[in-house]
């Protein structure tokens, strides 16, 4: 199926390469797109993935991962064995918690959230979120300029209680 769709284009399809074959292909590539596993990956790497992932990490100049770097648990951010070290990760629909947790930031590189369809926001607002990303722009109204003569007791205090049943 992939071979038919890429016929006549400068795309090479190689199924099940050895480490040596993969290193030759990586050496010829400007960019390596990592789409080995998806968001459901958990546990330890098995052959041939335990051979390919180190080869990509050692030989590729530029790696872009799709959704999450292969080898990373998308829910926890934990890497059990090895994981693709991406320069950039393009995650779909919404950022995954694992990209921001545990080992995730070390392996994900720059994060880009790609939309899969135009009316994404309408559907995603109806879904219970496990977490929400707070960015600097979200805090502007909370941190209005203060008078120069203010002291620490004039603005109140903060108590944060956080956690969940899923991530105690």
Residue spans of the language-model regions?
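Small-residue (G/A/S/T)-rich helix-start motifs and N-terminal tracts that mark the onset
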Residues: 1, 99-168
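Glycine-rich phosphate/dinucleotide-binding loop and adjoining beta-alpha-beta core of small-molecule
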Residues: 1-124
């Amino acid at each position: 199926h992939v071979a038919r769709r890429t016929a006549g284009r400068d795309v090479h399809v190689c199924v099940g390469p050895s480490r040596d074959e993969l290193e030759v292909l990586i050496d010829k590539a400007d960019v390596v797109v990592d789409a080995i596993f998806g968001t459901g990956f958990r546990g330890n790497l098995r052959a041939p993935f335990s051979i390919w992932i180190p080869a990509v990490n050692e030989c590729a100049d530029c790696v872009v991962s799709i959704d999450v770097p292969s080898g990373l648990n998308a829910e926890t951010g934990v890497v059990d064995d090895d994981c693709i070290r991406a320069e950039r990760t393009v995650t779909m629909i919404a950022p995954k918690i694992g990209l921001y947790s545990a080992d995730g930031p070390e392996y994900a590189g720059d994060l880009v959230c790609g939309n899969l369809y135009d009316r994404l926001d309408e559907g995603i607002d109806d879904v219970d979120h496990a977490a929400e990303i707070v960015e600097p722009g979200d805090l502007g109204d909370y941190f209005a300029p203060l008078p120069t003569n203010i002291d620490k007791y004039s603005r109140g205090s903060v108590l944060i209680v956080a956690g969940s049943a899923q991530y105690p």
